[in-house]
């Protein structure tokens, strides 16, 4: 992305390094002054220690009227005496240690040369250990200096504590090993490498000495050892030269673009082919040595078992169509070879061999073979010709195979011949028509058994795990997060320079690289407004050769401005990574939904019960449907059908229809928008019923309701339904209250629902969004048309949680989020998440779930149980008793103010057309059509006939 600007970056770096070389700033002046004073103190300390005289007055003794012999004077005598008293002979290295520490801490550094506090912390720990152990060793092994202990007070304390328990030898060993560990922490020297080096040198010296003693044999061995090394030595200069030439070229650009990443992805494809082919070739061979009758069925069974073993979940993801076709050809070749064996046997010894495949094929094609037998006069030849495709018959008539095997196959042909010898020969057209019917039936059977089609009724084994496992999802290979610090620093300098071109002074203070984007946090100079940078987002994207640049005006908790740039190589966030994260595992709510990962790569999950409703919007292809599927799959990983139930509305009949048949569904997936209003009306009625139950029990939400039911059941006092009345059911006693599950209503395309049904849907959704949170009913609304007529103010006011994918304009972004930013997203799951009660958006890279992942989880739940659909959800009840509180029927709508005048006009003129009403009263077509529909509802005019005309049913007025 920044390859074209590399030369500009280098010039910026050079100018920035040459400019500040004359003067030091304030902090650098203080550091350099402190460094000079530290060197002066180190020199003074060394002079005082090396010129120490025990006769000088000091902290240890007092002298009166004597000359001071220490070169540092009275201060030097006191300082040296104190250090000798504390450290003993280990006081001599202290001046050098002080000077070195001052140089490390206070010297002038480059802008990119930062202090690694972890490294220097370990070095400081190592230095402390070395000083303490050295004092202890000196106290044990060395004589005292003057009247001071050789290890000082520190050595005396350590030895007095260790000698009573460890003795001299044990104390020495412990201190020596601690001293070695301190040296490793201080210098980083590996004692193991030193031991290996000493061992290698010792072995080499021993081998050389042994070869010299061997004489002539040693001379024979030397040329054999030297010759292989010569070409290596000759190749080394050429290799180093080539490396030098590559290094002289712009090497950082090569590292920046990560060219080696696609090569690593192609490696698994090379290993898949040799792993699959031998298994397909070797499996069918052993049955050939056995009986021919069960051969084909065993091959089919083995083929079904080979597929999961030879192609794992990751291999299925990377497999190509060519590989699948090649494997299919191999299986077909073996099937043809197996079919050739029974055909030869039937022609020679049909009465001695009982072949299940042949008899099954003959049972299906009896009539076809008998018809063609009259024209070819050779039954055996016809069997060989028709024996090519017995697989369809074997699949469909496997249940009758045992009955057919009881009779010898040789008895079939005489029966067929005797039946058709007495009849007349049919016409060629009848034979051709019958053959077409048979071939079409076989083709339909083959199409139903196609493995690439979705099987509606599949008997799957019931899983033993209580919830779906991670093995159902695709697991990507381990990816190394390579971060090029030099490239990031160059980009940071480039950002600063481009902002300087627009007269904006800013400094990059923090860089946060992520899987998709990298955020640069800018510290603006005093007086610079954030709006200036926001208005330059397009210009910055052009200057930085980036696809889009997003400006984060406010970062919570920081006084900086964020600048988000897309990475050169984008990583895919998979659903398995987020579900395996601790954030998802630690969440206890059954309505936990997965969103993806933030810019730092951390998992982002949310609780739908706290949202409590979410609006998902974005253009076509931005990842909106994948995001909705990820939310549903995450709840399927957390909740059982007793905890969460779904009502899914899918106008496109593609995205949510795959969930048909899971036990979580309350009704079939709604694909007709006219039924969608009934489903929403049922949700409103269920919400009202739940509120009545909660008011009777004295709880405030669904969690308290379920907890109270559980406590009552544990106490032995179950609660009966207080809203039950006589006649509601066939039972004489009210039923017990059961646990209420959360209900999640998922609408994949909300705009289509608004266009078809209209204002009623908006009112129903508004009622659910206002009151349904405590009742445990939550909405997930998705739309690809973020316009104000779809996302109305009434809906936005009641759905505070929004998720915006890529949109085309700032207006659409403001429609969804009430702020701009979504127009700068990168697509393919890149989203802005606005939590409830917050005005700051969070950039999230949406998790990806493939179709295979969705089918795997859905089949896992289908194997656990079947759904218990409620028919009233879709069918509804349009009677007056089914009206919700505050709802009016269509007949109770207010009549138009011109209704009476239109009635008078229609009755007099005896014409009830819409165009006539429109011309007479000079109104719009929609209003005129509405008035005519009201006339039809009142029985004044009839319904339109086949020609569109309406008859006036009301009698004409009586004239005097």
Curated annotation (Swiss-Prot):
Residues 601-814 form the FtsK domain. Keywords: ATP-binding, Cell cycle, Cell division, Cell inner membrane, Cell membrane, Chromosome partition, DNA-binding, Membrane, Nucleotide-binding, Transmembrane, Transmembrane helix. It is found in: Cell inner membrane. Gene3D superfamilies: 3.30.980.40, P-loop containing nucleotide triphosphate hydrolases (3.40.50.300), Winged helix-like DNA-binding domain superfamily/Winged helix DNA-binding domain (1.10.10.10). ATP binds at residues 621-626. Residues 193-960 are cytoplasmic. CDD domains: TrwB_TraG_TraD_VirD4. It is a multi-pass membrane protein. GO terms for biological process: cell division; chromosome segregation. The keyword Nucleotide-binding applies. It comes from the Bacteria. The chain crosses the membrane at residues 35-55, 84-104, 117-137, 145-165, 172-192. PROSITE patterns: FTSK (PS50901). GO terms for cellular component: plasma membrane. One of its GO terms (molecular function) is DNA binding. Homohexamer. Forms a ring that surrounds DNA. Essential cell division protein that coordinates cell division and chromosome segregation. The N-terminus is involved in assembly of the cell-division machinery. The C-terminus functions as a DNA motor that moves dsDNA in an ATP-dependent manner towards the dif recombination site, which is located within the replication terminus region. Translocation stops specifically at Xer-dif sites, where FtsK interacts with the Xer recombinase, allowing activation of chromosome unlinking by recombination. FtsK orienting polar sequences (KOPS) guide the direction of DNA translocation. This is DNA translocase FtsK. It comes from Vibrio cholerae serotype O1 (strain ATCC 39315 / El Tor Inaba N16961). The gene is ftsK.
